[in-house]
């Protein structure tokens, strides 16, 4: 798919239809393609098709960034050592720039880069946990 279709509008929002195609294309390249995690039916991932994962990821994006490519928020959370830390969340997938080594945080505002990194991080999480994260939960990727 051409990146021109993923360009956000004036307010930073990306068309959901084009997002579905771009995410499906990215999922096809991963181990998530045809993978059915435990409890996936509750998130409408019945057969592990890339399109089903795309709709699942879009529901996550709607919850976190409202499909806004310019999304940028600093959240406070507790680390594993119990310290309060501030973490920046960027782009459609609300990605933490620290989890994307080698990528400039400014590039995470580009939908095509954010989709690649977001799918990569969720692939690692889903394969490690063996289940899909809850859509209404706070997910730190």
Residues of each region from the PLM?
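Catalytic glycan-binding domains that act on GlcNAc-containing polysaccharides
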Residues: 3-141
